[in-house]
Amino acid sequence: EIMPSLVGSEMCIRDRGEGVCMLGPVRFHYGCHTRVGNHCFMNFNFTVQDDAPVTIGDHCNFGPNVTIVTPMHPMLPDERRGMVCDDGVERFLCYAKPVTIGHDCWFGANVVVCPGVTIGENCVIGAGSVVTRDIPTGSFAAGNPARVIRPITAADTVRGRFPGIRG
């Protein structure tokens, strides 16, 4: 389900699974480079700058204001200025690295995922984190830069807090 306040009828995503819910506004720079798995939830202000491929697994949830970026820009000032190419046209240097997110991941509010990052399956990324490097499967990671805090284990269950809930 895509909520009416999303972005407009011209928005496209390369591949969107079943049962995806996006609470607008959400934004995709291109959209054609993004794949979203089944039963994912994107809260408001979810933003993907998909200059390179972005792959999101099944059953992923994103809190408000999560941003995924793939472009890389030069560090040196003279390389950030326009450069004239052999064809005489001024261009700005930029390249991009793909982002991959495994199945069953949860992202708290205000998380930023940086270019080239792979996040394994069954991960939780704490609110406000800036993910600059890969996160292994089954990890809770948080901070700026994000680091693995600990593995997620059966002791993390909340089922006992909700009597009558099964599943």
What spans do the regions from the language model cover?
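Conserved AdoMet
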Residues: 16
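Single conserved hydrophobic/aromatic residue that forms the stacking wall/gate
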Residues: 1-8, 12-13
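Extracellular beta-strand-rich, repetitive "passenger/adhesive" scaffolds
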Residues: 20-22
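C-terminal/domain-terminus segments
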Residues: 112-146, 158
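Extended, charged low-complexity segments
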Residues: 161-167
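Flexible, glycine/small-residue-enriched loop-and-beta-strand segment within the central core
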Residues: 26-36, 41-117, 144-145, 151-161
